[in-house]
UniProtKB/Swiss-Prot annotation:
Residues 1-10, 132-136, 207-224 are cytoplasmic. It comes from Sus scrofa. This is Voltage-dependent calcium channel gamma-1 subunit. Belongs to the PMP-22/EMP/MP20 family. CACNG subfamily. The chain crosses the membrane at residues 11-29, 111-131, 137-157, 182-206. Regulatory subunit of the voltage-gated calcium channel that gives rise to L-type calcium currents in skeletal muscle. Regulates channel inactivation kinetics. Keywords: Calcium, Calcium channel, Calcium transport, Cell membrane, Disulfide bond, Glycoprotein, Ion channel, Ion transport, Membrane, Transmembrane, Transmembrane helix, Transport, Voltage-gated channel. PANTHER family: VOLTAGE-DEPENDENT CALCIUM CHANNEL GAMMA-1 SUBUNIT (PTHR15025:SF1), VOLTAGE-DEPENDENT CALCIUM CHANNEL GAMMA-1 SUBUNIT-RELATED (PTHR15025). The lineage of its organism: Eukaryota, Metazoa, Chordata, Craniata, Vertebrata.
Amino acid sequence: MSQTKALKVRVTLFCILVGIVLALVAVVTDHWAVLSPHVEHLNATCEAAHFGLWRICTKRIAVGDSKDKSCGPITLPGEKNCSYFRHFNPGETSEIFHVTTQKEYSISAAAIAIFSLGFIILGTICGLLSFRKKRDYLLRPASMFYAFAGLCIFVSVEVMRQSVKRMIDSEDTVWIDYYYGWSFACACAAFILLFLGGIALLLFSLPRMPQYPWESCMDAEPEH
């Protein structure tokens, strides 16, 4: 591998590493979406919520004298209560989430995220082994694993987006306002870096095609 191509590979691997870190942050945190109800009475309290792939957290916030009828922002101080989703931890209760959205959505998003982490692990193993002499070919399966991981993150993001939409549209929930949090942004950035980084790594790791017919003859091994 030439020095120019090796430099491109290192830069691409660094971008993929950033994508891996962002994917891990998105999976383990619970700020994918922030939900708030409509505030009818001023100088009272309202209950906002934020959730991720594994748990939901609600916060009771004091509402001040404001023309804004929404609850929040979520960063305001208040009584906080977090619980893991019932289908992941039977010992915990999360009735709000269980009632207001479909269990299949959260299970699907979490399962696909786990598949993404699995592809990341396989890609990292191949990438580390490729640093040994004459094992540059392992960069190709590593690139595919990273691209697949990015696609899984994208699917998980889309499933979570549909889950939030169903929660807002449901008549059984008090949530009427929502916005996506920083965990969601980390997941979107991870998708871009992993998918595009995987494609770029595949292109950079491919052997150079001969421009002229005689170049392939010159590169051929001599017969004994």
